[in-house]
């Protein structure tokens, strides 16, 4: 569908998710560039549907002239890549939606992977009768120490209002509204449904439960657990196994590559 503008928003240390001295650490940022190219970018280039663009969101205070940021600009990909500051996001989208019926924003981190049908799946949900739609997943994989042989099922807690998701998306029907302040970052992980209902109430539209969708597809995404990812800092007080079950993934190398891209050295 050529009337869809789809941005995948990737937080490249764009907000204060850890101590500021770590947030601006050059070694951390250099590693982040390599991790992005190995994981998130590989899985996005592996998508069946490539009708989307990537936005790498960087912190408002990061110097754009430092090597890690310059390296992001040097990345060669068949997917269009934008590098912008977090506070520039709304204006950027407003400047680029003319002529489109739907704006889709999806979120993932630079160190995670999504299955090859994720973009295709969310774009199939565009419906002219639905003003604002949410889609997330609740059955993921955790990969420990960058080793595909060391992967486990991950079932984030779903409380009926939201779930910890790697690939969350919202569809904004631009025929109903052009309030671009609403994107995937407008909804929280755990309180997304009440926020969506509030939007419907504020705009005098009828909300239906099917407008908030949790997809139960098995093995939808891979949460890459390693020492440099933001949650290793953000959740340092939690048990190291909080993000996985005891159910090991028993799949061959080719299955991982076909589903998530060739991230395996």
What is each PLM-predicted segment?
Residues 17-33, 57-107:
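Active-site-proximal specificity loops/subdomain of glycosyltransferases
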Residues 7-20, 59, 136-137, 224-227:
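Short loop/turn segments at strand-loop or loop-helix junctions that form parts
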Residues 1-7, 101:
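A short, charged/proline- and glycine-enriched loop
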Residues 11, 32-35, 117, 121, ...:
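Domain-scale activation on soluble regions of proteins
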Residues 5-6, 45-56, 77-80:
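Short loop->beta transition adjacent to catalytic acidic/histidine clusters or analogous donor-positioning motifs
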Residues 24-30, 38-51:
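Short, acidic, metal-binding catalytic loop of nucleotide-sugar glycosyltransferases
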Residues 88-98, 106, 113-201:
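Conserved catalytic core of nucleotide-sugar-dependent glycosyltransferases
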Residues 4, 169-265:
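C-terminal catalytic/acceptor-binding lobe
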């Amino acid at each position: 569908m050529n009337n869809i503008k789809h941005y995948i928003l990737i937080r490249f240390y764009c907000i204060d998710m850890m101590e500021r001295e770590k947030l601006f650490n050059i070694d951390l940022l250099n590693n982040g560039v390599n991790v992005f190219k190995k994981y998130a970018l590989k899985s996005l280039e592996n998508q069946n549907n490539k009708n989307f663009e990537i936005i790498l969101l960087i912190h408002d205070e990061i110097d754009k002239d430092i090597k890690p940021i310059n390296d992001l600009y040097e990345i060669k990909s068949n997917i269009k890549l934008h590098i912008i500051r977090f506070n520039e996001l709304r204006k950027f989208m407003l400047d680029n939606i003319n002529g489109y019926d739907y704006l889709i924003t999806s979120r993932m981190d630079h160190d995670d992977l999504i299955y090859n049908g994720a973009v295709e799946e969310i774009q199939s949900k565009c419906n002219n009768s639905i003003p604002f739609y949410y889609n997330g997943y609740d059955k993921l994989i955790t990969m420990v120490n960058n080793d595909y042989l060391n992967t486990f099922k991950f079932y984030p807690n779903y409380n009926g209002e939201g779930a910890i998701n790697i690939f969350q998306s919202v569809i904004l029907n631009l025929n109903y509204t052009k309030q671009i302040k609403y994107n995937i970052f407008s909804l929280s992980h755990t309180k997304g449904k009440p926020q969506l209902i509030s939007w419907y109430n504020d705009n005098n539209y009828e909300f239906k439960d099917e407008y908030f969708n949790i997809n139960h597809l098995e093995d939808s995404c891979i949460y890459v657990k390693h020492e440099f990812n933001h949650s290793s800092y953000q959740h340092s007080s939690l048990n190291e196994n909080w993000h996985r079950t005891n159910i090991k993934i028993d799949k061959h190398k080719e299955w991982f590559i076909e589903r998530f891209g060739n991230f395996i050295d």
